[in-house]
Each structure stands twice: as C-alpha cells, then as structure tokens.
C-alpha cells in the first residue's frame, strides 16, 4: 500500500442546535522505483463523505448569541521515509570540514570534545553529526588514554551537522563505545553498544525513550557499523557483528521498528568475517553494504539485503581495485572472485554511497591513498554492473585527502532535498597522539554536486605540537 496523508478538518459550529461537519482530504504521492528503472507511481485516495443536514431556518424560534465555536485540527503524523532518486550531478565536491581542534585553546563549555568514529545521519528536516566521545575535552586533564577503543566513559553524542562538537553543543545520547543512528521519517533511532568484551550489549533508544536491547551471541566484542542504519517505510535495518578481530566474525542484521527489534536476519554466502559495514539503498527493494574483513582479505565483503523478503547474502567484491587497507597491488589477486589473496590481516571502514538515477545506478567508494597506512583518501565510482561479478577496475574520481594527511574511517550518507536525495561521503581525519596525549578526529565531507572534476582536497589545519 502506498503511504498517504489524510488531513481531516473538523469544524464544529453550534448555533441553535446546528452542527456542521466538513471533511477535507488531501493525498500525497510518493516516489517509488524498481531495482534498476525508477518510476513515479502516483495514486489518489478519497476520504469517506457525509451528507450535510440542513436546518429549516423558518422553524428556528431564537438565536443563541452566546453560541460557542470550537475548531479542532487533526494534523497528520509525519510520513515514513523512502529512498528517492538522487539529485542531479556527476561529480563530488568538497562540502564541509568539521575540525574541532582548531579551537583547542578554548576552554570550558566551548572546548572541543575528544571524539572518534564520526558519521552523519539525516532525517527529513536535518542531518546530525554523530561520534563516540571519551567524555573528555581538549585541552583538559582527562585526554590521556583516549586512543583506547572501549572503556566505561565513552558515549554516543551528536550535534546538528555544521556545528562543532563541543561540550556545549553536544547531545549525549547514551553510553556506548560502538554506535549507529538513523531517522525513519518520524523519529530518531539511536544505537549504542557497551559492556565488557565478553558480554557486550546493544541498546536502542527511540526519540527520548530507551526501548530495547540485544545481547552478545559470540561473546567476543559485539559491535555495530559506526555509520548510519537505513530506514524504509518505518523499518530500520542495522548491521551488527560479534567475533574475533583476527578470525571468524559473523554478522547479522536487526530489523527495528519504532525502537524495537522485530526480526533477526542471518546472511548467507561468504560469512567468515564481516564488520563495520557502510550501507545504503540501491533501490526501494535492496540495501547494499560495503564492509570490512579484518582477518582474511583486502577485498570488501559486499552485502545485498532484500527488504521485501528480509534475506541477505554476502560475497566479496570482484573488482581488481582493492578497497581495504592494508592491501596488495591492484589486480594482483588471481583466481575466482571469492579468492582472498594476501595482506588480508587488518583493515579499515570504507565509504560507500549510491547515486540512484532513472536509467542507471552509480556506486561511489573511498579508499586510502596509501596501501599500508591510514593516509590520504581517494574517491572511485562504478556505474551499473554487479559488484559480486564485475572484475573491472573502478574509475578514480579525485583526491579528497592528500597522502600527507590522515585518512581513517570513511562513511556514506544522503541529505534529503525537497524532491531528491544528495549522496555524500565523509572521512575521519584522526589526530593520532598515541597513548601519551589526546587522540581525536576531524571530519571532511564531500557531496554530489554539479559537473566537472573534484577540485580540492581537505586538510585539518591542526598541529598537535601547539
């Protein structure tokens, strides 16, 4: 059934026993599309009508001049969100830099928080910049030891995109050392994971209410994707994994509705190790994810999740452009698409976002410029085809971060314009102070806009020695 909005305006006019009811209906059409060819499918709905009974004015004996008038507006609930066609454009350009530690000499409530694992998620009215903080600011006496991934102080925080994540600006959503968030069109869903490594717990918050939990199933650092979950028609899909960082770690997907888990999805296929997926809608039927294998290969595990059947399958990307770090030379892995190759130990979360067009689909990816270090970040694109079977190289589309600058985790998200969605990729640029000083990040954002070539890279402008 297509979503529709019915507004009912009830007008009560009481005068000498006269009651009038007026029903007004309005319908909205939503944009739907198939896996490859996206089409408009308008529909109309008509509200039930009621005849109006007229009063014989000649029989009225008196008029009550003190008659009361009451008007009640029954406004519609916000609609669930659905993926739409992408806004027009053929290249990404530098959109925004959030570099909190350029303001590192500021103290008090305006001090920048120590953060890592930033990502962006968008609702119909705003985008929010999320991150995991160590509950410390810079400058300050508590920033030593902030290189550690998991502790009892870490929290999922957010600010409106464009704001600096300072003590004053940030909303603290929940205790968490791994996180995600997404907006279903009506409300935010927040995901936080914390607890001991052997028995971590996923916590779900819907709006302001804490609504559900999910326990560790492999008892080895249950964790989530560190980027936005994905919602369609009120259902939100979240990737989780549990298992060794250097061995087996099998992922699952949780289907969440209004903050409560309604289904678990167990992917088939190549499931040995899948973590830190970056996911988005290829269509209104399919979620696709480019993930990290930290144990066996420098190829990215690629997930296809059918939201109509709630089934998922994982295979390795077949392209000769290997997207993980560290990685071997492009094209050096021989054998079938499922061959792991070498240099598979270790990895990094990768950026991935869809460009949905009426006649084709673009898949945009990011990877570090260095094959061995988390330095630099380049953008790549492939139009149409199947990531599971296409062995061709991806097309380079520009340098977002030079090899002289840090390029750590990256992620994808989409900004909701009035009639279309704007695909974007974000890059975590980490200030790595080691164990003896603060360890935090800036965020660079590139979005689809206009044509031509990607023109300029991003620098953090931060000198940790200052």
From Swiss-Prot:
One of its GO terms (cellular component) is membrane. It is found in: Virion membrane; Host apical cell membrane. Keywords: Calcium, Disulfide bond, Glycoprotein, Glycosidase, Host cell membrane, Host membrane, Hydrolase, Membrane, Metal-binding, Signal-anchor, Transmembrane, Transmembrane helix, Virion. Residues 13-35 are annotated as: Involved in apical transport and lipid raft association. Residues 38-86 are annotated as: Hypervariable stalk region. The influenza B genome consist of 8 RNA segments. Genetic variation of hemagglutinin and/or neuraminidase genes results in the emergence of new influenza strains. The mechanism of variation can be the result of point mutations or the result of genetic reassortment between segments of two different strains. This is Neuraminidase.
């Amino acid at each position: 059934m297509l979503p529709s909005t019915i507004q009912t305006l009830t007008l009560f006019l009481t005068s000498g026993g006269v009651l009038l009811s007026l029903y007004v209906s309005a319908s909205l059409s939503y944009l739907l599309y198939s896996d490859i060819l996206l089409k408009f499918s308008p529909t109309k709905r008509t509200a039930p009508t009621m005849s109006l009974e007229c009063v014989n004015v000649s029989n009225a004996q008196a008029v009550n001049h003190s008659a009361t008038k009451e008007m009640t507006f029954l406004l519609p609930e916000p609609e669930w969100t659905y993926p739409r066609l992408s806004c027009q454009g053929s290249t990404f350009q530098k959109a925004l830099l959030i570099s909190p530690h350029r303001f590192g000499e500021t103290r008090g409530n305006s001090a920048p928080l120590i953060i890592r694992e930033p990502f962006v998620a968008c609702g119909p009215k705003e985008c929010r910049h999320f991150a995991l903080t160590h509950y410390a600011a810079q400058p300050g006496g508590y920033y030593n030891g902030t290189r550690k991934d998991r502790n009892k102080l870490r929290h999922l925080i957010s600010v409106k995109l464009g704001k600096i994540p300072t003590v004053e600006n940030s909303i603290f959503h929940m205790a968490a050392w791994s996180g995600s968030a997404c907006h279903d069109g009506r409300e935010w869903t927040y995901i936080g994971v914390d607890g001991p490594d052997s028995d971590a717990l996923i916590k779900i918050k819907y709006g302001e209410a804490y609504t559900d939990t999910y326990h560790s199933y492999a008892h080895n650092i249950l964790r989530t994707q560190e980027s936005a979950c994905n919602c369609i028609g009120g259902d939100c899909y979240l990737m989780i994994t549990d298992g060794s960082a250097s061995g087996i770690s099998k992922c699952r997907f949780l289907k969440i509705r209004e903050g409560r888990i309604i289904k678990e999805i167990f992917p088939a296929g190549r499931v040995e190790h899948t973590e830190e997926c970056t996911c988005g809608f290829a269509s209104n039927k399919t979620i696709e994810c480019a993930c990290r294998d930290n144990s066996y290969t420098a190829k990215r595990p690629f997930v296809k999740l059918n939201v109509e059947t709630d089934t998922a399958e994982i295979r390795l990307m077949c392209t000769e452009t290997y997207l993980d770090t560290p990685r071997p030379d492009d094209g050096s892995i021989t054998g079938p698409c499922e061959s792991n190759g070498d240099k598979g130990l270790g990895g990094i979360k990768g950026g991935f976002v869809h460009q949905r067009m009426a006649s084709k689909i673009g898949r945009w990816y990011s990877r570090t410029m260095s094959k061995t270090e988390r330095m630099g970040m380049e953008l790549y694109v492939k139009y149409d085809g199947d990531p599971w079977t296409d062995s061709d190289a991806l097309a380079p589309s520009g340098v977002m971060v030079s090899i002289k600058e840090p390029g750590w985790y990256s992620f994808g998200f989409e900004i909701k314009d009035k009639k279309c969605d704007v695909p974007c990729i974000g890059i975590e640029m980490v200030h790595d102070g080691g164990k003896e000083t603060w360890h935090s990040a800036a965020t660079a954002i590139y979005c689809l806009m206009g044509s031509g070539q990607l023109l300029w890279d991003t620098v953090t402008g931060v000198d940790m020695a200052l």
